[in-house]
Amino acid sequence: MTETTPKTAPWTVQKRTAVLVLADGTVIEGKGLGATGAVEAEVVFNTALTGYEEILTDPSYAGQIVTFTFPHIGNVGANAEDIEDLTPANRHGAVGAIFKADITAPSNFRAAKDLDSWLKHRGIIALAGIDTRALTALIRERGAQNAVIAHDPNGNFDLDALKARAANWCGLENLDLAKDVTIGQSLVWKELPWTLQDGYGEQDAPQYHVVALDFGVKRNILRLLTGLGAKVTVLPATATAEDVLAHNPDGVFLSNGPGDPAATGEYAVPTIGKLVETGIPLFGICLGHQMLALALGGRTEKMHQGHHGANHPVKDYTTGKVEIVSMNHGFAVDSDSLPENVEETHVSLFDGTNCGLRVVGKPVFSVQHHPEASPGPQDSHYLFRRFINLIRERKGQAPLPEREQAA
């Protein structure tokens, strides 16, 4: 009987070419992928099983390193269709990624390149071959971590310098990143939702006009609005209420985005407060939800570890139904701080944090989660129809069914 030598697991690292250095001095070694260099950021974990390209290009992840809890990332490669940031040339999104297993060759008919090459093109530093379950447990116990991720193919690292960078990084609190990821000038969005038969079509006969304030908007949000008949004009985060009203919109959308919502107080929050008073239908998502709460007199707070994934249960108090939704936020609205004329409409069934609000007597509402998914379940797509119905009501038109009827 011949003894066989145990095979080395494919994710076992032979030589360190990347490190993650936490602010407390902890050093985690692994294999480097993607771009080279070093960058400070906050380390979070995401529990989604699919959609890594959409996750990494979501501008809400600016200033963050995403740890994927699912072990096999990159199996379906990458393409130009699944990105979410509005201006790909500016590469807004996560600055780092952490994987359990090494990236394998892609196997998917839509793959245009392998994930490693795509990460390099996007400027994303990646670390593979580590115990992501242990890192996730650390984040759950200690909270989201300030850190430096570094990649050098030769494995040369000045750990003392990296530890100092991690310890001295300011973190996301009081950090305004919306100005960094917003568009430079206005644009009209016409792309429709993707279908297998036609890919992305182009809108030709809009029925309504929605102005979207871009604090880091995702493409699929804009597609769902155009898919419901809205012409969408996208304005920069710094647009004033007068800028918005000059477009004579039927509705206003407040987008998702990165950073601390309170840090936008000098420009976006006052603008939102003025727009609420106009009576124009208004819908906010994620950062837009948080800034709306601030404009209404509420408060926001930094969360321990945040919510990042595509499997979060949320209850809609307006219907009594429970939805499974996508989430990506590290700040939350303090529901106890909301004034009497603001109702809490949605709540997380994981930890009871606020996930939605509406203003009594006004066509104004928002949610913390991501109803557009991309990636994730489509349980909350009805919220876009709810927004369009507020526009239709103001025009004297009959409402659309909030949920598509089964054939």
Curated annotation (Swiss-Prot):
Catalytically driven reaction(s): hydrogencarbonate + L-glutamine + 2 ATP + H2O = carbamoyl phosphate + L-glutamate + 2 ADP + phosphate + 2 H(+)
UniProt-annotated binding residues for L-glutamine: S60, G257, G259, L287, Q290, N328, G330, F331
Keyword annotations: Amino-acid biosynthesis, Arginine biosynthesis, ATP-binding, Glutamine amidotransferase, Ligase, Nucleotide-binding, Pyrimidine biosynthesis
InterPro entries xref list: Anth_synth/Amidotransfase, CarbamoylP_synth_ssu, CarbamoylP_synth_ssu_N, CarbP_synth_ssu_N_sf, Class_I_gatase-like, CPSase_GATase1, GATASE
EC number annotated for this UniProt entry: 6.3.5.5
UniProt enzyme class: ligase
GO MF annotations, alphabetized: ATP binding; carbamoyl-phosphate synthase (glutamine-hydrolyzing) activity; glutaminase activity
Region (CPSase): 1-205
Metabolic or biological pathway, per its Swiss-Prot or TrEMBL entry: Amino-acid biosynthesis; L-arginine biosynthesis; carbamoyl phosphate from bicarbonate: step 1/1; Pyrimidine metabolism; UMP biosynthesis via de novo pathway; (S)-dihydroorotate from bicarbonate: step 1/3
Residues annotated as the enzyme's active site: C286 (nucleophile), H370, E372
A matching Pfam family: GATase
GO biological process: one example: glutamine metabolic process
Glutamine amidotransferase type-1 domain ranges (all copies): 209-397
SMART domains in alphabetical order: CPSase_sm_chain
Subunit structure: Composed of two chains; the small (or glutamine) chain promotes the hydrolysis of glutamine to ammonia, which is used by the large (or ammonia) chain to synthesize carbamoyl phosphate. Tetramer of heterodimers (alpha,beta)4.
Entry function: Small subunit of the glutamine-dependent carbamoyl phosphate synthetase (CPSase). CPSase catalyzes the formation of carbamoyl phosphate from the ammonia moiety of glutamine, carbonate, and phosphate donated by ATP, constituting the first step of 2 biosynthetic pathways, one leading to arginine and/or urea and the other to pyrimidine nucleotides. The small subunit (glutamine amidotransferase) binds and cleaves glutamine to supply the large subunit with the substrate ammonia.
HAMAP family: CPSase_S_chain
Protein name in the entry: Carbamoyl phosphate synthase small chain
Species of origin: Brucella abortus (strain 2308)
